[in-house]
Amino acid sequence: MAVDGSVTLELKNISKYFGSVVANKGVDLTLHKGEILALLGENGSGKTTLMNMISGIYYPDEGQIFVNGREVSIASPQDAFRYKIGMVHQHFKLIDLFTAAQNIVLGIKGRYNIKRINEEVKDIADRYGFAIDPKKKIYDMSVSEKQTVEIIKVLYRGADILILDEPTAVLTPQETEKLFSVMRAMKADGKSIIIITHKLREVMEISDRVAVLRKGEYIGCVNT
């Protein structure tokens, strides 16, 4: 069950077209504070396109987005972060020669105190149970460690709403269980999480509710 009944994110009648292709059509969706919501659908169902509109990669052609009851316009990832929304994509955007901490603050304006940043990254890791060395170079990391850096990156920027796009696709079963443990810790801390997946077993294990998309349209949502 969700920690809090308040709606933190709401989509109303969201549509997106690419020429004659309908990616999403009239989608309604709600996410509550402290909830893990699974977004389920086959490949090409519009899951990632929908989440890309929430995270500022695409802009909806129709519909409204509300964050904490307020209508917002999200035209860029910077806008999304302004509303405390962060998305972790399947393909990581990290610089191999940089450390975890350097990647996490990359793009943030201002001077860096790397010692302080290392400490802040470690604090976030300890808070949610991540296993990561802030000083470790990306080229020395496993795939799961790289994913951890991407998740901490959005948490460092203050995200309260996290979108994870097929996060288990690159993980072993043991790494998946560790990720789910971290997700439960974030949920307990009041974070709201959307996990994009097509794996029903994982939906039943980790989510509070599951919303189903098919051919770009919202089919329904049920408690899990």
Model region roles, listed by residue range:
Residues 2-224:
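Glycine-rich phosphate-binding loops of nucleotide-dependent enzymes
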